[in-house]
């Protein structure tokens, strides 16, 4: 062992308390990086898998009233991989314990089969039975907040008529991970819920038999999203199209993506604080050590040690804490 290495070992032992403290701060920063980055990547993977399994739409468009045969023209558009149409309306819900009426967003489901775009996942209960007129599936967040479950009933005013509806299932959907009421910026699960109902029942109730007022598209990987939206707007314009928009502007996705982005930013900012504190402490310790050893440095240089060798000695001292922290994380 060289003289400088013996000197380094002696200094590290003498300052073991400070160096161990710095190593713990660095280890905390590294652990935070690994944990939060892993959490972010896991959440993103889960989001993408959920979107893929539920066939989450890439483009939405609302229209006043369009004939169902128009669907074939939309399917023939370049870049479109799948199309689904539906009937969608808002209605007042008669619920106890509220000082103002609650609102429900009624969305049609095919009576036979499942939606080709924006499917739902049952959490409890069953799917709507064919031929029934008063069965609904409730969004999970709303059902939880209102204490509703399959077997309960709920009263709604649908197109001016009060109807008692039987809750047969509770479901989730990527489209309504966060259900945001119209005119609001944030979800309100106590006053606003999603209710899925048979299209054969909901359509005639709003004079939408053989027609639709909402269309969702999934795009092929090589599709030009802007071009598809422009062409879709052109097709729907004569039927009172209200403007198509991409997934990036879909309210629930926008909120969820914002939370994921916040998670990613925090995964960078918090570790940076720990590592910054560690760097500050290490700078204090190293600076004090160099100031107190000016005489020793002069002696070393007098004995023929070059500036590079002396500098390497103090660099190894500075690296001791991060190396110790890294070794601790590997263990």
Predicted regions, residues:
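Membrane transport/envelope proteins' first extracytoplasmic loop
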Residues: 1-276, 307-308
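Amphipathic cytosolic juxtamembrane alpha-helices at the membrane-cytosol interface
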Residues: 13, 20, 301-320
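Hydrophobic alpha-helical transmembrane segments in multi-pass membrane proteins
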Residues: 18, 22, 267-270, 317, ...
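Conserved G/P- and acidic residue-centered "switch" motifs that form tight phosphate/ATP-binding loops
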Residues: 151, 304, 329
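Small-residue-rich transmembrane alpha-helices
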Residues: 276-298, 319-331
């Amino acid at each position: 062992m060289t003289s400088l290495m013996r000197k380094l070992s002696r200094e590290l032992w003498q300052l073991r308390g400070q160096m161990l403290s710095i190593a713990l701060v660095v280890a905390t920063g590294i652990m935070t990086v690994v944990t939060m980055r892993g959490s972010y990547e896991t959440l993103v993977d889960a989001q993408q898998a959920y979107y893929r399994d539920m066939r989450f739409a890439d483009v939405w468009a609302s229209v006043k009233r369009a004939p169902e045969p128009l669907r074939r023209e939309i399917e023939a558009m370049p870049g479109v991989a799948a199309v689904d149409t539906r009937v969608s309306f808002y209605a007042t819900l008669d619920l106890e314990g509220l000082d103002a009426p609650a609102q429900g967003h009624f969305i049609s489901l095919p009576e036979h089969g499942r939606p080709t775009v924006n499917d739902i996942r049952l959490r409890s209960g069953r799917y709507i039975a064919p031929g029934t007129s008063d069965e609904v599936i409730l969004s999970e967040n709303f059902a939880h907040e209102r204490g509703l479950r399959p077997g309960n009933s709920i009263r709604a005013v649908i197109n001016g008529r009060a109807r008692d509806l039987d809750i047969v299932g509770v479901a989730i959907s990527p489209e309504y991970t966060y259900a945001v009421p119209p005119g609001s910026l944030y979800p309100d699960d106590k006053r606003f819920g999603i209710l899925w109902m048979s299209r054969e029942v909901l359509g005639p109730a709003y004079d939408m038999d053989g027609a639709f007022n909402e269309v969702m598209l999934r795009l092929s990987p090589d599709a030009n999203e802007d071009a598809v939206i422009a062409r879709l707007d052109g097709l729907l314009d004569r039927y009172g199209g209200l403007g198509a928009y991409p997934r990036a502007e879909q309210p629930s996705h926008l909120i969820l993506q914002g939370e994921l982005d916040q998670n990613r930013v925090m995964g960078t900012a918090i570790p940076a604080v720990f590592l910054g504190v560690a760097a500050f402490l290490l700078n204090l310790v190293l600076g004090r050590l160099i100031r107190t050893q000016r005489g020793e440095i002069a002696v070393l240089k007098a004995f023929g040690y070059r500036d590079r060798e002396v500098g390497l000695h103090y660099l190894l001292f500075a690296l001791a804490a991060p190396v110790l922290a890294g070794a601790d994380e590997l263990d």
